[in-house]
Curated annotation (Swiss-Prot):
This is Probable aquaporin PIP2-6. GO terms for molecular function: mRNA binding; water channel activity. A motif (NPA 1) lies at residues 106-108. The gene is PIP2-6. Its main location: membrane. CDD domains: MIP. Expressed above ground, and in flower buds. Belongs to the MIP/aquaporin (TC 1.A.8) family. PIP (TC 1.A.8.11) subfamily. It is a multi-pass membrane protein.
Length: 289
């Protein structure tokens, strides 16, 4: 269907797009489809590659700026380079996997989409497990290939930086994840996609750019989590007490941020609550007519 060919339902509602129906919470029939397992595998591989490239970049940055090892600030990629590595990999991997799994690569994104009824509980849990396993394997490969530098430079693990309290750390993770998940909702909004055929193709770009911008802002505070799988995988392989003590920050913050973004987009910007209220009023009116 082209944008100029409206169905009778669309004409009556005055809409030139169709919202996809909400996904059932318990959609067990997915377990019988190969496309489901293909999507889970895609999430595993994408998260593995994401952690492999980004953690290598972080360790390379720290080794190049280590004065004791003959490095210097001008010899490294800097925070800008690290941010580009994270944002660039998200752009690449979302572009590659969007048509297969939706390109989540992040339990917080999956959680936000689940709350918005975009994915089922079965798919959400499976994605999160695959993402955490992929992240762990990705960091494991980094340790194998960079065994000399891995433990010396912190293993790319997320930890609350000195001088910041827990509240600041959690707040940074909440706001950072809100920016990311809000961008995901906006970039994949069917209303916007219906009006511009280029939007679906370009969606990975703003998503990756949001990751880049959030990293610039929050690397000094928490090292930037906004992705529980990224934080979990690094903590498992690095296995440092402080990394484990701070681990909850990188789950609570992102999940709260994702929940707020889902609520804001669905019930404020898309007026989900008003639509539901209007539907109930219409049904009650028909019953009493």
């Amino acid at each position: 269907m082209t944008k100029d060919e409206l169905t009778e339902e669309e004409s009556l509602s005055g809409k030139d797009y169709l919202d996809p129906p909400p996904v059932k919470t318990f959609e067990v029939r997915e377990l019988k489809k190969w496309s489901f397992y293909r999507a889970v595998i895609a999430e595993f591989i994408a998260t593995l590659l994401f952690l492999y490239v980004t953690v290598l970049t972080v360790i390379g940055f720290k080794s190049q700026t280590d004065i004791n090892a003959g490095g210097g600030a001008c010899a490294s990629v800097g925070l800008l380079g690290i941010s580009w590595a994270f944002g660039g990999m998200i752009f690449i991997l979302v572009y590659c996997t969007a048509g297969i799994s939706g390109g989540h690569i992040n339990p917080a994104v999956t959680f936000g989409l689940f709350l918005a009824s975009k994915v089922s509980l079965v798919r959400a849990v499976s994605y999160m497990v695959a993402q955490c396993l992929g992240a762990t394997c990705g960091v494991g490969l980094v340790k194998v290939f960079q065994s000399t530098y891995y433990n010396r430079y912190g293993g790319g693990a997320n930890m609350l930086s000195d001088g910041y309290n827990v509240g600041v750390g959690v707040g940074a993770e909440i706001i950072g994840t809100f920016v990311l998940v809000y961008t995901v909702f906006s970039a994949t909004d069917p209303k916007r996609n219906a009006r511009d055929s280029h939007i679906p193709v370009l969606a990975p770009l703003p998503i990756g750019f949001s990751v880049f911008m959030v990293h610039l802002a929050t690397i000094p505070i928490t090292g930037t989590g906004i992705n529980p799988a990224r934080s979990f995988g690094a903590a498992v392989i690095y296995n440092n007490q402080k990394a484990w003590d701070d681990q909850w920050i990188f789950w609570v913050g992102p999940f709260v941020g994702a929940a707020i973004a889902a609520f804001y987009h669905q019930f404020v910007l898309r007026a989900g609550a008003m639509k539901a209220y209007g539907s109930v009023r219409s049904q009650l009116h028909e019953l009493h007519a």
